Amino acid sequence: MSSHVVSLTEELVTPILEEKNLELVDIEYVKEGKNWFLRVYIDKEGGIDIMECGEVSELLSEKLDESDPITEAYFLEVSSPGVERPLKKKEDFDASIGKNIFVKLYEPIDGSKEYEGTLQSFDGETVTMEYKVKTRKKQVEIPYSKIAKARIAVTF
């Protein structure tokens, strides 16, 4: 059910975003407690503002009401992905070269399932990161297929 709702929502929101020159980052349909949430994360170069999120929310809400694909009551949320933006697509990794990222793996590489460091390169199949162990810099190559989750990591 969840993946069906996500697919239908993507079909409905894509033309809206293309018209406004916005990017779809992610869609989630999740139950939290008793409530269902349909969350649509959008962005653009230079960041997105609350007015743009509101416009997309109104237009998407109209489209969802027309086709009515969701049987249960839910809350629609349209927002920016935030500063710790998820890296979901290969293009996200290309756009994040030189940035600090956090990666969680399906299985360990060199004894670890989590890495945080600078994304050095991405060739479409392998993520190369530089990370620190105490004061020493190390490098790890991670096959894209082994990445469970990845996001921008903010450091202070």
Curated annotation (Swiss-Prot):
It comes from Oceanobacillus iheyensis (strain DSM 14371 / CIP 107618 / JCM 11309 / KCTC 3954 / HTE831). Belongs to the RimP family. This is Ribosome maturation factor RimP. NCBIfam families: PRK00092.1-2. SUPFAM superfamilies: YhbC-like, C-terminal domain, YhbC-like, N-terminal domain. Signal peptide: none annotated. It is found in: Cytoplasm. One of its GO terms (biological process) is ribosomal small subunit assembly. Required for maturation of 30S ribosomal subunits. One of its GO terms (cellular component) is cytosol. InterPro entries: Ribosome_maturation_RimP, RimP_C, RimP_C_sf, RimP_N, RimP_N_sf. The keyword Cytoplasm applies. It comes from the Bacteria.
